[in-house]
A protein has these predicted regions:
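A composition-driven surface/loop motif
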Residues: 93-95
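Short, T/G/N/S-enriched strand-turn elements that build extracellular solenoid repeat scaffolds
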Residues: 1-9, 25-35, 41, 142-143
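Structural signature of tandem-repeat unit edges
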Residues: 14-22, 41-64, 73-91, 102-116, ...
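A structural signal for leucine-rich repeat
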Residues: 30-36, 66-72, 123
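Short conserved micro-motifs at the rims of enzyme active sites and ligand-binding pockets
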Residues: 4, 64-65
Length: 149
């Protein structure tokens, strides 16, 4: 996905529909596009992605990578450690905290065959107005929608 969109456009796109296989690198790229990603040096991305449709996508894990999830503004947690979670992609559900802290994300369309939504998957998605939960979902994790409006 990174090669197709490129760094020039990734922070400008507001609506995105993806099909095919998505891996952890793609999810990390999506988080950058949505303006919610800090790397280990504290670099921040100012993306504008608000609408994400991954209904035709399959989440895959080919390399067991992990990603640390951090809030958009670390000053919110001044004096305390930033919350973080290990996120693993698999074909059964959304990993823990995979879309956490996407403060400006307004709509997400999940894969049609999704089986579960992980713990904290959408925590602090404060602008979320619409999300589909496919009939195939059998489990929704703890605090999956905590602090969502």
């Amino acid at each position: 996905m990174h090669e197709r969109i490129g760094n020039n456009k990734k922070l400008k796109i507001e609506c995105l529909r993806l099909t095919g296989m998505l891996n952890i690198d793609d999810i990390q790229f999506i988080r950058e596009m949505a303006g919610c990603y800090y790397d280990t040096k504290g670099h921040k991305y100012d993306g504008h992605l608000r609408y994400l449709d991954i209904s035709g996508a399959t989440l895959t894990n080919t390399d067991n990578k992990e990603v640390s999830i951090y809030p958009r503004d670390p000053s919110e947690y001044e004096g305390t450690p930033w919350p973080s979670a290990e996120a693993y992609i698999n074909d059964k559900g959304t990993p823990v905290a995979i879309f956490a802290y996407l403060y400006d994300m307004e709509e997400i369309v999940l894969p049609a065959k999704l089986k579960s939504i992980g713990d904290d998957a959408f925590i602090f998605c404060r602008s979320l107005k619409s999300i589909n939960i496919p009939e195939s979902v059998q489990k929704i994790g703890l605090s999956a929608f905590y602090f969502c409006i």
